[in-house]
């Protein structure tokens, strides 16, 4: 596990055996206490996982402020049942959701209007983007600013493309 310690950097840490015995696994986003084993090599052990504000199983994360749920408008067409399951899961954990629909550059106006009619009326913030043309990315950047955000969605919808535009060093 890589643990970011404010003002000291990133430490490569192992979880103590006590976590395995208690069937607790550290998650991305966990706030933890570590013991430093080797300062020069930035090695340590996770000794305590602090209480979680929230946690998700898929993606396996904890302590998030919001979720950016990404689906394509087309190619692949949105699977509404899957999208609704994402929304129900986030609602059950009281995690605010921003819905991001990618591939606006190849979508038709009726496709966009259908998504607006369904999900805007439910009160979800919607962002329509084209990762290919880097359109709408600044809106996402503003919505993410200062928040710990989980990004979720099915394969092939452009999650990695959006992340790579937002943070090229993440590639």
Where are these regions (language model features)?
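Conserved beta-strand/loop subsegment of P-loop NTPase cores
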Residues: 64-71, 93-102, 123-129
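Canonical P-loop GTPase G-domain recognition
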Residues: 105-157
């Amino acid at each position: 596990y890589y643990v970011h310690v404010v003002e000291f950097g990133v430490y490569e840490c192992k979880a103590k055996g006590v976590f395995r015995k208690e069937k607790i696994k550290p998650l991305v986003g966990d706030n933890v206490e570590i013991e430093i084993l080797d300062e020069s090599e930035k090695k340590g052990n996770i000794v305590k996982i602090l209480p979680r504000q929230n946690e998700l199983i898929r993606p396996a994360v904890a302590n998030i402020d919001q979720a950016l749920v990404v689906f394509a408008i087309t190619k692949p067409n949105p699977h509404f049942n899957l999208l609704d399951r994402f929304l129900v899961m986030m609602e059950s954990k009281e995690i605010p959701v921003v819905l991001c629909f990618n591939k606006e550059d190849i979508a038709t106006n009726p496709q966009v209007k259908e998504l607006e009619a369904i999900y805007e009326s439910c009160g979800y913030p919607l962002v329509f983007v084209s990762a290919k043309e880097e359109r709408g990315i600044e809106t996402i950047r503003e919505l993410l600013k200062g928040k710990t955000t989980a990004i979720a969605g099915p394969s092939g919808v452009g999650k990695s493309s959006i992340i790579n535009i937002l943070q090229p060093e993440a590639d």
